[in-house]
Amino acid sequence: SALEKKISFRPGFPADWTPVSISNGKIGEAQYSLIYTRAKDTATLRIKSERAAGYGFIFEPAFGLGTNILQATRNGAPLEIRADDRPAAQAVRPRMEFPLSGDDTVELRFVPAPEVILPDVPAMTGDLSRGLRLVRSTLAGRDLQLSLEGLWGETYTLEVLNGERVDSATCSFEDIYGKRHDQPLAAKFDGRTLTVEFPRGPEGYGKAEVTLKLK
C-alpha cells in the first residue's frame, strides 16, 4: 500500500515452477524489481529498489503443509519469521518483514514436505472439464489428507515432490448418497507419483479422500 509505504509479495506458485520475476514494479514513489527462486530446501528472494526510503517489504511465500521452517536471513543477517497460525490454512506461510535498502537478498531454509502437482490437462475453448481438482488439503498428525474431485471411471496420475517422506497412500470415495467407501487399493504411490483410480459410476465428478501417511 502506498499510504502505509509497504510492498507485499505472497507467492503461492506450484512447487515445480521455474524462477519468477517482477520488473518495474511501482507503489507510490518506490520502484522495484524482484526474482524469486525455490529449490528443494531453500527459497531465495532478491529485490532491488529505488526511491524506496522508508518503505517496508512483506514476504510471505507458501509451502506445502508439514514444511518445517528453519531460519531466514536478509543480506546475511538473521531475519525474524512470524508463523501463520490459522487452523484452516492450506499451506505453511512464514511471514518476514524488513525495510528496503536498495538491494536485498532474503534466504529461507526449510525441511520440505510432500507436495502434490496436479496433472496439466490441455483444453480448448468449449471443452468440458475433465481435470482432477484438489479441493483442500489438511494435515492431521502424520496424515496428509487430500480432498479430490475427479470423473468417475477415470484414472489420474499426480507428481509428488519430496516423495521420500511418504510411507503409503490409501483412498476412499463418496457415493451419490454421501456415503463413504474405503478402497485402499485405488491409490498407488511408487515413490514419485500418486495414481488415483476412480471407480465406474454416474456421469460427472465424484469425490475422493486420499491419505498420504508421512514417515
Provide a role label for each language-model segment.
Residues S1-P184, T193, P202-Y205, L214:
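Non-catalytic C-terminal accessory modules of carbohydrate-active enzymes
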Residues V210-L212:
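Charged, long alpha-helical assembly modules
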